[in-house]
Amino acid sequence: METLMKMKWKIGSVEIENPFILAPMAGVTDLPFRILCKEQGAGLLCTEMVSAKAISFHNKNTISLMQIDPVEHPVSMQIFGSEPDLMAEVAKSIEEQPFDILDINMGCPVPKVVNNGEGSALLKNPELIREIVTKVSHAVKKPVTAKIRIGFEGYPVDPVEIAKIIEDSGAAAVAVHGRTRQQYYAGEADWDTIRRIKEAVSIPVIGNGDVDSPKKAEALVRETGCDGIMIGRAVRGNPWIFREMNHYFTTGELLPRPSWEEIREMILRHARMQIELKGEFTGIREMRKHIAWYTSGMRHSAGLRRDSNLVSNYEELEKLLDVTVQR
C-alpha cells in the first residue's frame, strides 16, 4: 500500500507512534477502556472531559476521572470551561500530573455544557477562544491543543478562522469534528472543512467524524490531508479498530473482525478492570452499556443486552456469556 501519511508524528514535543487517536467521550473513555485501546494499538489516548471549575473545587468525582496509568502514554487530558484565568490556573495546578498533552474542549454539544457558555458555545466568541488558548498555553509547558466543531446554529462561525486563532494563540494542534453543534452526530461529517483548515494552518490537524473502518480512515486522509485520525463512536465496543487501522495502513490488508471468543474475553477483561477500579457494584453496572456496544449487530444481542441488565456480579456475567455461546 502506498504511504498515505507518516505513522510516527508529534504534537509539540510529544512523540506519537501512529496517527490513530481515541476521542474523548464522556462515560466511555475511562481508564479501563483507554488501556484496552492502547493495547490494541491506539497512538494517542484522550480522557473523558473534565470541568476546570470542578477541578478548582477539588470535586471528588472529577478528580477520579483524571486518573492515569503509566501504560497509557502518550495521553491527552481534556478540560472544559469558559473562564480564561480560571482555566489557566487549573492547567498550571494539574501540570505535574502524568498526562502528556492538555486539550481544551470547544466542541461538546450537550445543552448543560453549552448553556454555561462552555464546549461548542465558545465557537460563538472567537476572541474568548483566543484568550483561553493564550492564557492556558502560557501557563503550562506541556503542549496545549483544542477540539472544535465547524459551526454553531444562528452564529456566523468561520471554522478556518477559529483554527487560525487557535494556532496563533499557542496551540500545538487542533482537532476538528466536521459537524456543527446543531448536528450533534447526525448527518454526514463535512470533511471538506477539515481540508480547508489543514490548508490554512501549519500545526497538526486531527480529523474527526464518520471514521468507522480502516477504509474510511484512508478516505479521510485522502480527502483532507489530516495528520491524525480521531475515532469516537466507532470505537465503543470495538477497541480492535486500532489494530485493524494500523495493520491496513502498514500492509494494505484488512484484518478479519474479532471472533466471538475474542469479544467474550474482551468483555470479561474489561469487566475485571472496571471492578478493580470501581468495585463490583459500580463496575458491573457500568459494563452494561459496553456489553450492548460489544455485541451490537450479533445474533442474540437483543436478549443478551436485556439479560445483562439483570447481572449484578462478575460470576453472573461470565455465566451469561457462556450461555450466549451455546444458544
Describe each model-derived feature in a short phrase.
Residues 1-8, 12, 16, 20, ...:
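Alpha/beta catalytic cores of nucleotide-metabolism and tRNA/nucleoside-modifying enzymes
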Residues 25, 50-52, 80-82, 107-109, ...:
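Active-site beta-loop-alpha junctions enriched in small/polar residues
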Residues 2-10, 25-100:
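Glycine-rich, positively charged N-terminal anion/phosphate-binding segment
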